[in-house]
Structures are given as structure tokens and as C-alpha cells.
Amino acid sequence: MSNLINIKNRINVVTNTRKITNAMQLVSTSKLHRIINLTKNIKAYQNLVETTFDNIVSKITQEELNEIFPPKQETDATLYIIVTSDIGLCGSYNSNVINELKKVIKPSDLVITLGTKGLNWIRVSKFKDQLYKAYVNLEDKLDYSIATEIGNLNFELFAKNKISSCKIIYTKFVNNLIQEVSVKQLFPYDSSHLEIKKESEQMEGDIEFEPSAEIILQRAFPLYVSSMIYVLVSLSKVSELASRRVAMESATDNADEIINDLNLEYNSKRQSVITQEITEIVAGAQATN
């Protein structure tokens, strides 16, 4: 009888867990459907920002670009911005980002974390002294003011010779089932792809800049960095919801299988107990006769 009680308790525990995973799956699906409609607009905005900036950069030489943002000889430190979630139960979403950071981080680098999971990890890791700033309790859609603040921090650190570059590690949204960890350099601007664009005739025609491309670039670059942070973090949030939906769907399916197996085991043992009790009753009746 004690075995039956234990099995029944396990069924209740798994059933309660299934209710949680199923609820989180439904919530993630609802949020994903809502936010995925914004993805096209976000990607269109990203394409507009990148194309506009490419057009500006294409009008100046690499030497002029180096004069505006001179390469730092005093340090080779990189500021890494990592995008993680505030809550778990989203598969390997957070661990993939953290593992990517582990591959590339150097002792002189600095880290800005977005999301509670990234902060919790770095606080207990050997990289805890490299944490520069953390942002937690973010909404499904990043507040643009936070992106602007991070962009300004980047240029402050660069001006103080604390860093020579800035990169963001985020999760690229491919589709509902595929999300890929990516690293994008935000600063200095990587213009290596411009020649390829020119050869494929994707660049715009002649554009006149007033007062000059150099001055516009100098003023526009902080906007570019902030915009890219906003876009990439927003796309990461889509990936987070997709990862959580898949993880919770898998967990719910696994719970259903476990419940079915436990029910079969419970019914089998219960049948054995009943059969044994009937046998004992019959044997007792025969003994009295």
C-alpha cells in the first residue's frame, strides 16, 4: 500500500509541474505571437540604420575615419555587452550566450550584462571583477533610453582609454525553432563589407552631405550604436520567448509521458494488491470451512 501512496504522490507532483510548464508555454506563445509581428518592423529599422550609416562611411576614407575615432594604442580591452533573460526555463538560451563570452573574454575586458541571469552568473564567476554595469528586470521590449545610456557609456570608456572596442553578444532570431548566438562589433565601425556592397551595386548613388560626411558621422555614430543595441536586444527578446516556448512545450510533453507511465504503474500495482487481497480472503474462507 505504501508503494501505491508513493506513486500517487509522484503523479500529483508531476501533474502540478505540468500545470506550470503548460501555463508558461501558453504565456510565451501569446507573447511571441504579439512581439513577432514587431520583428519585421525592427529588422526594417535595422536595415535602414545600417544602410544609412554605410552610405555616410562610404563617402570618407579609412584615414579620415581613423582621425574621427583614432585607434587606441594604450589598451586592447573590449567592452562586451551580453544579453540574457531575467527568468529561466528557456532552454540553453542563457548558457549559449555565457559560453560565447567565455571563449573570447580577456582579463582586461569589461562586461555589461542585460538580464538577471547574466548578472547572477558573472557575480560568482572568475570574471566578477570585470563587471562594469548591470541592467535587470527588463521588459519584453527594451526601453530605448537604456540603449542610449549604454551607448554613451561606450563612448565615455573609449574617451578615457579604458576600451578600444565594443561588441555585443546576443541571440539572433532565425525562426520559431532556430535561434543562433551571434557577436557583433559595434565600435569601431567595421567597414570591410562596404567594398562588397559596392561591387554588388547595393550602395546608394551619389549623396551630398551638409556640412560634411565627417561631421555627420561624428554626430551620428552614437545614434548608430544606441540604435543597434536597441535592435539586437529586441531581437534577442524574441529569441528568448521562442526558446522558452519550445522548452516548456518539451517539458509539458515529457510530463505527459511520465504521468502516463506512472498511471500504468499505479494501476498495475493496484491490480496486484486487489488480487492479493482477494486471494487472502478466499484462502481465509476456505480455512474456516
UniProtKB/Swiss-Prot annotation:
Designated name of the protein: ATP synthase gamma chain
Disulfide cysteine pairs (residue numbers): none
InterPro entries (alphabetical): ATP_synth_F1_ATPase_gsu, ATP_synth_F1_gsu, ATP_synth_F1_gsu_CS
Topology of this chain in the membrane: Peripheral membrane protein
Organism of this sequence: Mycoplasmopsis synoviae (strain 53) (Mycoplasma synoviae)
Function: Produces ATP from ADP in the presence of a proton gradient across the membrane. The gamma chain is believed to be important in regulating ATPase activity and the flow of protons through the CF(0) complex.
Keywords: ATP synthesis, Cell membrane, CF(1), Hydrogen ion transport, Ion transport, Membrane, Transport
One of the GO biological process terms: proton motive force-driven plasma membrane ATP synthesis
PANTHER family noted in UniProt: ATP SYNTHASE GAMMA CHAIN (PTHR11693), ATP SYNTHASE SUBUNIT GAMMA, MITOCHONDRIAL (PTHR11693:SF22)
GO cellular component terms listed in the entry, alphabetical order: plasma membrane; proton-transporting ATP synthase complex
Quaternary structure, from the entry: F-type ATPases have 2 components, CF(1) - the catalytic core - and CF(0) - the membrane proton channel. CF(1) has five subunits: alpha(3), beta(3), gamma(1), delta(1), epsilon(1). CF(0) has three main subunits: a, b and c.
Subcellular locations according to the entry: Cell membrane
A molecular-function term among this protein's GO annotations: ATP binding
Protein family (similarity comment): Belongs to the ATPase gamma chain family.
Pfam families noted in UniProt: ATP-synt
